[in-house]
């Protein structure tokens, strides 16, 4: 059985990592990689978790499945490697960031600095076949990422959750906790829905206000 090291997340997810469905999921993804192209690269499958350990989580931005075109998916929701053309949803996120906080538009789409500052950028499905959106959506990833969200109930620190679009908002029942929580819902930032309420939703300032109200430092949302 393949051993997955999730660092500090491992104790929170041990039951999932040992479950038969998870072994079958990894086997299926491995077979898909052997037969064709799967994104993100294998070493980046769990990057969202390893980049933002549980004790550092201050905000969670939930995505769907990874980008399915070459060179884009890097293991963080909405993020692309520096130098890659910005996908439309990310471009809209940056527009809202500028409107909300007055920050300059970033030069690139790598959101790793956010992850390192405590923003968990989690897709609900962690792999995808090349050119085939949602191709791995029914493989078992959602059971695993639901467990990640449910495990965060045990985190004692204040955490803000950002749920963009109806798919993300279905996860709201998993986010109950005795610790301080903020759940922000808005339409998805894709061009199809961004003008229905994503623009003007001001998530970044709301997250920082919530954190400061609960005695925490605000997130530094600046990007290169």
Write out the residue ranges for each language-model feature:
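Short, low-complexity, intrinsically disordered N-terminal peptides in bacterial proteins
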Residues: 1-5
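A polyanion-binding, active-site-adjacent surface
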Residues: 6-8, 15-163, 167-177, 182-185, ...
